[in-house]
Amino acid sequence: MKKIFYNASLPRSGSTLLQNVLAQNPDIYATPTSGLSTLLQSAKETYSKRAEFAALDTALMKKAFLGFLRGGMEGFTNNLSDKKYILDKSFNWGGDYYLLKYMFNGESPKIIMMVRDLRESVASMESQYRFSPQHVYPKIDLETTQLTTLEKRLKYWAVSNPFGLTLDFIKEIFTAKIENEIFFIKFEEFCAFPEPVMKGLYNYLEIPYFAHDFDNIEQVTDQNDGFYIFNHKIRKQLKPVEPKALDILGPEACNWVYTNYEWFFKKFNYAL
């Protein structure tokens, strides 16, 4: 079976950029946003709820179901690419640590999580909303005034998938004290010091290092952004990004994000 790694990064924090940098390595197939985790969760839900499984020998069904999960993942990834390593990108992997460990006989999965100053992540979402007026944001309802202001959108994003859910996954990782099993990357450090960050990542993945070209990043992850609210286009050159949150959100909204997620800012050493 191929080696599979999992990119479970925070939304609007550079996960697509990271995929395309790593895709420069000829041994790595980096996916666009993937539904593989969703397939596993759907199978898990069916297995847990259906009487056809519950009524049979528990030990036998457990063995068979584990084989189904592993075999399904193997078949899926083998048909994606002939390359040695698969880097599958989904926000949902952040909540799948224990499932993946269960599937592979106690072996800890290699999960990468890119994080960013939350004010900048939220500002990126708000910017996408404002500057894509041709798209109808699916949750906005003019009749009920749902999500018709920045304040309402902030509160919605904070408790919804994928942004709020990924933050919950991150918080649970620290609560469960498994943060040392996850490779966290600060987006700001990745942009400013990409080579040492990548060397640390390769060391975590336990694969041979590849010298990347951070000045000429080709976008090879191909997906139809018409199915998503936000686009996934990347910059060709990796360099620090100027902060925009204060200009886009204003001080009140920035303070709201900090106050409600102070634990995050402290865990990852982001200043007020």
Pin down the residues of each PLM region.
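PAPS-dependent sulfotransferase catalytic core
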Residues: M1-E74, L80, N224
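PAPS-dependent sulfotransferases, especially Golgi type II membrane carbohydrate sulfotransferases
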Residues: M1-F5, F174-T175, N203-L272
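Short active-site oxyanion
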Residues: I4-F5, K84-Y85, K110
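Short, well-ordered beta-strand elements within core beta-sheets of diverse protein domains
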Residues: Y6-A8, I185-F190, L246
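Short, solvent-exposed loop/helix junctions and linker helices
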Residues: R12, C191-A192, P251
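Generic structural marker for isolated residues within well-ordered, non-membrane alpha-helices
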Residues: Q19, Y97, M198, C254, ...
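Alpha-helix-centered segments that form part of catalytic cores
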Residues: A64-I86, K155-I170
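PAPS-dependent sulfotransferase catalytic domain
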Residues: D88-H212, G226-I229, K233
